[in-house]
């Protein structure tokens, strides 16, 4: 079973958000990185650009496939994880830590899945 940290909220498309006040850190879930396989490239938006909940904000490329990344939150990108340019494997090695993708200043309250709701969704997919 994939790791599902209890301090995060989740999307149906396997992204997570760590909400801290009016900001969020965003990444993909352990389940998503397992399904993708070895990540070889991540394309992220520019700092200062806007992201919209449920809309694509970049792509992630693995040895198996290229997939869109969907934002769990709406707001302005304040930081991107530039270390992924040189070390995209961090997404596989530590998806909830060093493999984070971007930080966003929230423009609205996100409507996301609790850890329990996300776990049930994974069980339904199996």
UniProtKB/Swiss-Prot annotation:
Cofactor: record remark: Binds 1 lipoyl cofactor covalently.
Residue list for modification N6-lipoyllysine: 64
InterPro entries per the UniProt record, alphabetical: 2-oxoA_DH_lipoyl-BS, Biotin_lipoyl, GCV_H, GCV_H/Fam206, GCV_H_sub, Single_hybrid_motif
Record key words, sorted: Lipoyl
GO cellular component, one term: glycine cleavage complex
Cofactor: (R)-lipoate
Record protein name field: Glycine cleavage system H protein
Organism: Rubrobacter xylanophilus (strain DSM 9941 / JCM 11954 / NBRC 16129 / PRD-1)
């Amino acid at each position: 079973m994939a790791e599902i940290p209890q301090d995060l909220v989740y999307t149906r498309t396997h992204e997570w958000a760590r909400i801290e006040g009016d900001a969020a850190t965003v990444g993909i879930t352990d389940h998503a990185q397992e399904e993708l396989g070895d990540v070889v490239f991540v394309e992220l938006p520019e700092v200062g650009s806007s992201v919209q909940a449920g809309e694509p904000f970049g792509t992630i490329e693995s040895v198996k496939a290229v997939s869109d990344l969907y934002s769990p939150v709406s707001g302005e990108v304040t930081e991107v994880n530039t270390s992924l340019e040189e070390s995209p494997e961090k997404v596989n090695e530590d998806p909830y830590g060093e493999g984070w993708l971007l930080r966003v200043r929230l423009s609205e309250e996100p409507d996301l899945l609790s850890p329990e709701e996300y776990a049930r969704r994974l069980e339904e997919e199996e």
